[in-house]
Amino acid sequence: MNPADLEQLMARAKEAQARMAELQRELALRRVEGSAGGGMVKVVATGELRILQIEIEPSLLAAGDRAMLQDLTAAAVNAALANAQKLVQEELQRASANLAVPNLADLFGAGERS
C-alpha cells in the first residue's frame, strides 16, 4: 500500500469517526413512539434505545386489569424500541452511504435480524 493510499484511508477513518460521534449525538435527541391497545399505552424512546416516557390512559388504570396493563406496557415498549432500532439502522445506512464505506449498521450490530 502506498503512503498516499494510507493517508487517504486514515482521512476517511477520521471522517467516519467524526460522523459517527455526530450521529450518536443526533440519535440521543431523536424521539420515536410505540403504542399498544389502540393507543391506550404509549411509550416514547430515544435513538439511543432509552425509554423516556410511558403514558397510560386513565380508563385502563380504572379497569384494574393488572395482567392486561402489563401486557400492553410490554407491547408498547417493544414497539418503541423496534421503532428506535429502525431509526438507528436507517441513519447508519445513510451515514455509510455518504462516507462510501461498508454498511455501518452491520458493523454496529444494528443490521436486519432474521
Task: Indicate residue ranges for each PLM-predicted region.
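A short interface-forming secondary-structure element
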Residues: 50-69
